[in-house]
Amino acid sequence: MSLDSEVSVSSSSGRDWFFPSPSFFRSSPSQYGRRFHTNSNTHSAPSSTYPSGIRHRRRVKFSRTPTTSSNEKPQISIVSDKPSAISKNNLNWLSQFGLQFALVTLTIVFLLLLLLRNTHLESQVNKLQGEILRLHACHQLDTLNVSSSTAHKSQDTHPCSCENFKRNLALFLSFMLLLIPLIIFKYIDYVSRSRLSENISEQVSLNKQIAYRVDVFLSVYPYAKPLVLLVATLLLIFLGGLTLFGVTTEDLGHCLWLSWTYVADSGNHASSEGIGPRLVAVSISFGGMLIFAMMLGLVSDAISEKFDSLRKGKSEVVEQNHTLILGWSDKLGSLLNQLAIANESLGGGTIAVMAERDKEDMELDIGKMEFDFKGTSVICRSGSPLILADLKKVSVSKARTIIVLAEDGNADQSDARALRTVLSLTGVKEGLRGHIVVEMSDLDNEVLVKLVGGDLVETVVAHDVIGRLMIQCARQPGLAQIWEDILGFENCEFYIKRWPQLDGMLFEDVLISFPAAIPCGIKVASYGGKIILNPDDSYVLQEGDEVLVIAEDDDTYAPAPLPMVRRGSLPKDFVYPKSPERILFCGWRRDMEDMITVLDASLAPDSELWMFNDVPEKEREKKLIDGGLDISRLENISLVNREGNAVIRRHLESLPLESFDSILILADESVEDSAIQADSRSLATLLLIRDIQARRLPYVAMASQTQGGNFSKGSWIGEMKQASDKTVIISEILDPRTKNLLSMSKISDYVLSNELVSMALAMVAEDRQINDVLEELFAEEGNEMHIRQADIYLREGEEMSFYEIMLRARQRREILIGYRLANAERAVINPPAKTGRRKWSLKDVFVVITEKE
């Protein structure tokens, strides 16, 4: 140990250690091998530095980071005699592959030996059978014929051996054809790995690639599964027949037929004899059962997929001249009812409905609708109107009318979707045969839709139309029922038709030329087909002009010879002075500014409009200004704001309800989400207002009403009816089921908004020209419907015909279209007996089309 301490430190500055050599190392150096490789960079110390008994040892590099000095660079030694991980992996799978390949080879050799053994035994059996036949022949024949029989036997030996070789070859081929796929699928990964040298990058195995290709083939191509099943069946028949040919004495054709019978019917193998034929027959029958199980599965899946496609509405609608409805809303039921009534005269029709809903849900909702379709069939399909493929699925290019329903919810979003739907419809390559009727939610967006759709589009601004209609009905009680009769197809509606026999006739004479219709206007051909409502009596019909009439159906009227009608004069010239009115709005609508503008144009000066809702006053003014209303420019009305809840009695009692001429209960869209909830709120407000009004009636009126005994069982209804004679209340009703409640109580002249919009959509869908007529009747300017008192046209007890009153109304530039008797509940539009004379009462009222005052 003292010798080691004498080693100079300066000679090992590079972390090189020197070990002394023990004596037994020097004595037997060959007996112990070196544990470390010799470092080529070892620096030998000078021999003079060490004593004579000390031997210089080699330096060894350890796996430590060398500390380099300023004069020396670090040296890195690479050890390369250890095998890499890649080489070990290659050796592992090569050894496994060799072992498994050897096992497969031994199996094949064993099978071949068995096959050869079987062949040898079969040849021995054939030889023994030949010897038996020869001995039997020798016993029967004389000795002279032995040579000939021997020659005959020698001639037959060669064909028998050839036949045996063929059968053995067939048996061998059948086994090989069964083993080859197994070997390929078993060792295909090793083949793919053998192509990888030392590349350690990740690659997909060939087995997975083949499985992926098969999966793509089966999923992409529609006839892939039946084709695979057919190929599997043919392979089973071929392999089975080939195997039967090897184990039986039948020819190949008969063996193939037997194989088919085993595949087709698993019970046919019961007649097989022998171990070999029975094993093969059982195997073929088992494969046949699998084949038929797969076939039944494919057939069942195909049938289920087809029924599922039909159930979910994925199949194509092969129809022509049908009505197509895109979208789903609460108006669909009323719309289907009106279209079914319109198609009744044609023997029924076809209506296709496509919406982004499940087909079963749509059919279930339509099945719950309580009306008769009258021979019209409704077909539902699931899809989006924004996708051209879904539009083609409902034969959009062959439809005679396309109706686009507005969505429930935000008006701008609904109109934006309608705009995109129109863009999709105009992008159909085949073109459109019919016109497009679009239900709009906001009047400001109507221009954009017409700009995109062009001449193909007809718009019905539902919300604004209902608002203006409510104002008309509020100022003229009973007008709501008249609008329902005219817009619906159940009674009389508008029709336009050309009658060449009327050319050259004055419009005054045309008015009394139709016994079953009432002319209302002329479609002037010289004006580009413009419809003129209520033209002058002196207008002469020209060639190409068409007559606008109100009739029960398009085939129920025709011109007749002119009747003899006595012309009279009006009793006196009535001029109704306008008096200020007080109107109350309960609730809030998004088109409030439009309703205020219409009221300001129709009411007398110094009129008042009270707005009662839960919207703060500052927010109301902001909404009205944003809608384009300048409150300072209102000429005839002044706004009175009251804040409160319309379903709270205490808030309603703070209003002078008995002093209003008209009360409009609006469906408050900001509060309620569904039609039923909105109607419930409107109905509650209506009953509260009528009850408050009835309690504020004078005592004398209530006493006289009670003494009459008319309402002994329901005095509250009688009191409300008494109050309704003073104030007209119009309720905006969204759900048609609420109609019966209000009609039974008779306490409100209701407006069924959704049903009226559906009627307008159906009418424009059947004839797009009617849209111009409706737009003028609903607009601020032009003509409108009015209810007139009878004393304007006749005297008390005067006997006149309907035609005579019509000619008197023409002196006021009005077109008489119907009447309502004093003791009747409903008006009669387009009465049948127009020439029959009868006595009239001054309490009767007449319905006319006249210019707006």
Curated annotation (Swiss-Prot):
Membrane protein topology class: Multi-pass membrane protein
Upregulation details from the record are: Slightly repressed during the first 2 days after bacterial or Nod factor treatment.
Subcellular location(s) of the protein: Nucleus membrane
Q: Region (Disordered) spans which residues? A: 1-55
Tissue-by-tissue expression? Expressed in infected and uninfected roots, leaves, seed pods, and flower buds.
Where is this chain compositionally biased, Polar residues type? 38-51
Q: Which UniProt keywords apply?
A: Coiled coil, Ion channel, Ion transport, Membrane, Nucleus, Transmembrane, Transmembrane helix, Transport
Per the record, where are the segments of Low complexity compositional bias? 1-30
Q: Which residues form the RCK N-terminal domain?
A: 320-461, 580-752
Outcome of mutating residue 264 to T, per the record? In castor-2 / Ljsym4-2; altered selectivity of the pore resulting in a defective calcium spiking. No nodules formation or arbuscular mycorrhizal symbiosis
- As recorded in UniProt, coiled-coil segments are 117-137
- Name the GO cellular-component terms: nuclear membrane
Q: Enumerate the transmembrane spans.
A: 96-116, 168-188, 227-247, 279-299
Alphabetical list of InterPro entries matching this protein: CASTOR/POLLUX/SYM8-like, CASTOR/POLLUX/SYM8_dom, RCK_N
Top-level division of the source organism's lineage: Eukaryota
Give the UniProt record's GO annotations in the biological process aspect: monoatomic ion transmembrane transport
Q: Which family does it belong to?
A: Belongs to the castor/pollux (TC 1.A.1.23) family.
What do we know about how this protein assembles, alone or with others? Homooligomer.
Q: What does this protein do?
A: Ion channel with a moderate preference for potassium over sodium and calcium. Involved in perinuclear calcium spiking but not in cytosolic calcium influx. Closed at negative voltages in presence of magnesium. Required for early signal transduction events leading to endosymbiosis. Acts early in a signal transduction chain leading from the perception of Nod factor to the activation of calcium spiking. Also involved in fungal entry into root epidermal cells during the establishment of the arbuscular mycorrhizal symbiosis.
Q: What is this protein called?
A: Ion channel CASTOR
Q: Which organism is it from?
A: Lotus japonicus (Lotus corniculatus var. japonicus)
Q: What is the lineage of its organism?
A: Eukaryota, Viridiplantae, Streptophyta, Embryophyta, Tracheophyta
In the UniProt record, the gene name given for this protein reads CASTOR
